[in-house]
Amino acid sequence: MKTIIAAIFLGILMHAFAKECTLMAAASNFNSDKYFDVPHVYVTHSKNGPKEKVCREYNTTKNSDKTTSTTVVTLKTGGTQSIVLSCNNSPKSGVKGQYFMDCQVPGGTGGINIQLESSIIATDNKNYALVHFCPITGRGVTEDIVVLQTNKDNVDPGVTSAIKNYGWSLENWKSRKDAGCQ
C-alpha cells in the first residue's frame, strides 16, 4: 500500500513539475548595451501565443540603475481593444541575457500584476531577437517564444537561421503580418 501511495504521489509531482517552464539559455552574442539601444520593436511571430490577430509593440528605455523599462502595447485588429503593460526589467544575477520582468497596467486599480522571466535566445543586437518568456505569476499567461523585429513587414534572415538552428519551422508559428500594425 505504501508503494502505491508513493507511486501516486510521485506521479502527481512529476505532472505538476512537467508544466513548469524552464528558461532557455541566452544567446552567447547578447550585448545588453547594443540590444537595449533599439527602442521600438514589433512582435512578428509567436510560437505559443493566441491565434487571434493582434499587433504587439515593445518600447524600451534604459534606466540609470542598469535596469530597463518596457512598455508593451497590444492592439487587436481594427483597434477595438488596447492593452498597455508597463514592465521593469532587472537582469538575473550572473546570467547574461536573462531578465526578471515585473509588469503592471499603468493607471489600473492595482489588480493586474504579471511577473515573468525572459531569455534572449537569439539576436543580432540591432534588428531582431527571439525571446523566451516563462511566467512566474499571472493568470492566463503562458510560456511563449516570440520574434521581435524592427521591421514588421519582412523576416530577417537571422530569424530564419535561428529558428532553423532550434529545429523549428516559422511556418508553424502564429504570424502577426496581417494584424495591422501601424
Curated annotation (Swiss-Prot):
Very abundant protein in the salivary gland, accounting for at least 30% of total salivary lipocalins. Belongs to the calycin superfamily. Triabin family. GO terms for cellular component: extracellular region. Residues 1-18 form the signal peptide. InterPro entries: Calycin (IPR012674), Triabi/Procalin (IPR005657). GO terms for molecular function: toxin activity. Keywords: Disulfide bond, Hemostasis impairing toxin, Platelet aggregation inhibiting toxin, Secreted, Signal, Toxin, Vasoactive, Vasoconstrictor. Disulfide bonds join C21-C134, C55-C181, C87-C103. The keyword Isomerase does not apply. Its main location: secreted. Inhibits platelet aggregation, vasoconstriction, and angiogenesis through binding to distinct eicosanoids involved in inflammation (acts as a scavenger), and has a role in inhibiting host innate immunity by impairing platelet-assisted formation of neutrophil extracellular traps (NETs). Inhibits platelet aggregation by collagen (IC(50)=30 nM), thromboxane A2 mimetic (TXA2 mimetic), or arachidonic acid (AA) without affecting aggregation induced by ADP, convulxin (GP6 agonist), PMA, and ristocetin (vWF-dependent platelet agglutinator). This is Dipetalodipin. Coiled coil: none annotated. Expressed in salivary glands. GO terms for biological process: symbiont-mediated perturbation of host defenses; vasoconstriction. It is found in: Secreted. It comes from the Eukaryota.
